[in-house]
Regions:
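Solvent-exposed, well-ordered amphipathic alpha-helical segments
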Residues: 1, 9-20, 117-130, 166-169, ...
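Serine-esterase "nucleophile elbow" of acetyl-processing enzymes
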Residues: 1-59, 64-69
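Intrinsic structural disorder
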Residues: 1-4, 38-39, 151, 172, ...
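Conserved catalytic region of serine esterases and O-acyltransferases that act on ester linkages
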Residues: 2-3, 14, 62-63, 70, ...
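Alpha-helical cap/lid subdomain in secreted, periplasmic
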Residues: 41, 61-191, 195
């Protein structure tokens, strides 16, 4: 079944009844004691639920077998900060430009491998799906912010390439999360930022449910 396709059944194909989030983007965000659903959508028109599946769980279960059978929509959203941190670029200077680029390329390759498998999961499930780019950081140190932005651009290029190849639509968080109030820390979103992402993502899911089959960019 084609990704971004609309499955039969239910009162309306574009009603989000069960959203499955593939990725760890909400893992380190402090949303308080409220249910995640209430933070993302404070006053929903229809009852809905959220299932978060981090990449290791999806890969261990074998792609779409990890996705609940009653899922209606999928969002793919990964915190790429771990990969950028793992590259070591933000912690110490590189001996050479070529060495820094090679280290970054290796980290991006690892990231893309995981990301591609999450896309395969969504395509196999055949549910309306949107993909989120990585969130920009807000490091106070200008040099650190520039390095992070450069690394982020390479990772986002991998996301866009995989998404376009799979004909999945993209929520570009670089344009969504563009205010200081969207961030709780240098690298983590605030509740307000999370809610902005949820609003754009929800609109994107509604549209790809009604008009599947081609890549669009939302922000």
């Amino acid at each position: 079944m084609q990704a971004n396709s609309v499955q039969e059944g239910g009162s309306s194909a574009d009603v989000i009844r069960h959203l499955v989030l593939l990725g760890d983007a909400l893992e380190n965000i402090d949303i308080g004691a409220e249910p995640v659903e209430a933070v993302l959508v404070p006053r929903p028109r229809n009852p809905w639920k959220l299932t978060i599946l981090e990449a290791p769980h999806v890969l261990e279960r074998g792609w779409s077998r990890a996705i609940p059978i009653d899922a209606t929509h999928i969002g793919i959203c990964i915190d790429g900060g771990w990969a950028i941190e793992a590259s070591g670029l933000l912690r110490s200077g590189a001996a050479s430009v070529s060495g820094a680029l090679e280290t970054l390329a290796e980290a991006a390759d690892q990231f893309e491998e995981v990301f591609a498998k999450l896309i395969d999961s969504a395509r196999e499930a055949g549910l309306p799906t949107v993909v989120c780019t990585l969130v920009p950081s807000r490091h106070e140190d200008p040099a650190r912010r520039r390095i992070a932005a450069t690394a982020l651009a390479i990772f986002n290029d991998r996301i866009i390439r995989q998404s376009v190849a799979a004909k999945l639509s993209i929520v570009d968080l670089r344009f969504v999360c563009d205010e200081e109030s969207d961030y709780a820390t240098e690298t983590l979103l605030s509740r307000a930022g999370v809610r902005k992402v949820a609003n754009v993502g929800r609109s994107a899911l509604y549209e790809v449910s009604r008009e599947p089959g081609r890549t669009r960019v939302y922000f």
